[in-house]
């Protein structure tokens, strides 16, 4: 597994990271053993970057990772950890964005406790509180670095203009955005701005929430998952179209002797040297399969073929439901 630099300070992380949302029950029931098996498999494959967040299972993802570190002595030093804060939950499960200094400080300290660590490499604001100036939030994050609790800071789902403002206050280590063959929105500004300020673009949902895998979720499966049951791309008639058009992509991957997931990851890695995809999975077999994308060198003609099969805008339906769009910053 090759490495890439995280942010301006050059921390070396694997070119493929591991998304920790799957360590909660977001994509189906997951237990601690599954999580620990995935973490061990990641180390065996050379994957050393874990991305998690409080909101993933209300701390459950972080807790399971922390339990792994406690159980497996020396494993903590082998991983480069990122987590996130800024989304507050109420007694009845309601959510709101809170980027205040007091709340972010409290969230970070609780994350460190669950992870059983004294410091994380990267701390993101998961969603921006629109009413609070991003300059103020960036200043808060910078203080966590000075306190030694965080090595680098980042933001998830912000616009290029917000990123530009933040970068003038303190160096931004990473930006997290959904980016894949099915969602190419970052190419309209955030990819260029991240390159300009030397921030890493961490791509979540790099497999199109299953559409770019060998076995995309059918409507029955999608309706059992809270994240997908209202997602326009996984509602009919959009889903049938999206599965049909990606069939040719699966055939191309098969002809190349790799899985569709590996090809989707390889494509992303070819889009920029500062891009690090963070797929999530509950299967060690799937992790091994997609990790092979790091070994694939795509020729110009292969990249052209992929663009013909899945041209920009091919996916029917928005990437988020109306409710899910509350928080991410739209631009362009």
Model-derived regions, located:
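Terminal-tail/helix-coil boundary detector
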Residues: 1, 196, 224-251, 255, ...
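N-terminal binding-site loop/beta-alpha segment at the start of enzyme catalytic domains
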Residues: 1-79
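Conserved, mostly hydrophobic/aromatic
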Residues: 6, 18, 35, 50, ...
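N-terminal small/glycine-rich loop or linker at the start of catalytic domains
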Residues: 8-27, 82-96, 119, 124
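Structural preference for beta-strand elements that scaffold enzyme active sites
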Residues: 13-17, 48-49, 78-82, 119-122, ...
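Active-site beta-loop-alpha junctions enriched in small/polar residues
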Residues: 21-23, 53-55, 84-88, 125-128, ...
């Amino acid at each position: 597994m090759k490495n890439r630099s995280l942010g301006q300070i050059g921390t070396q992380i694997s070119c493929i990271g591991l998304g920790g949302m799957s360590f909660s029950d977001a994509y189906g029931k997951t237990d601690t053993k599954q999580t620990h098996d995935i973490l061990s498999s990641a180390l065996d494959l050379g994957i050393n970057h874990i991305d998690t967040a409080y909101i993933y299972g209300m701390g459950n993802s972080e807790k399971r990772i922390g339990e792994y570190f406690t159980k497996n002595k020396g494993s903590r030093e082998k991983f480069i950890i990122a987590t996130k804060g800024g989304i507050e939950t109420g007694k009845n499960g309601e959510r709101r964005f809170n980027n205040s200094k007091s709340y972010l400080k409290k969230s970070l300290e609780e994350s460190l406790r669950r992870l059983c660590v004294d410091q994380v490499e990267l701390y993101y604001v998961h969603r921006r509180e629109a009413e609070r100036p991003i300059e103020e939030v960036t200043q808060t994050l910078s203080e966590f670095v000075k306190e030694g609790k965080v090595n680098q800071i980042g933001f998830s789902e912000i616009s290029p203009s917000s990123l530009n403002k933040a970068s003038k206050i303190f160096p931004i280590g990473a930006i997290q955005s959904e980016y894949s063959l099915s969602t190419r929105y970052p190419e309209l500004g955030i990819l260029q701005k991240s390159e300009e300020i030397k921030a890493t673009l961490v791509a979540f949902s790099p497999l199109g929430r299953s559409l770019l895998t060998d076995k995309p979720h059918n409507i029955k499966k999608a309706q059992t998952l809270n994240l997908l049951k209202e997602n326009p791309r996984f509602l009919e008639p959009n889903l049938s179209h999206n599965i049909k058009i990606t069939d040719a992509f699966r055939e191309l991957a098969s002809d190349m002797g790799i899985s569709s997931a590996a090809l989707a990851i390889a494509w992303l890695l070819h889009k920029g040297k500062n891009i690090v995809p963070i797929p999530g999975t509950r299967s060690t077999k799937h992790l091994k399969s997609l990790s092979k994308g790091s070994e694939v060198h795509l020729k110009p003609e292969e990249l052209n073929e992929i663009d013909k099969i899945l041209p920009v805008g091919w996916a029917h339906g928005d990437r988020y439901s109306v409710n899910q769009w509350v928080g991410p910053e739209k631009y362009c």
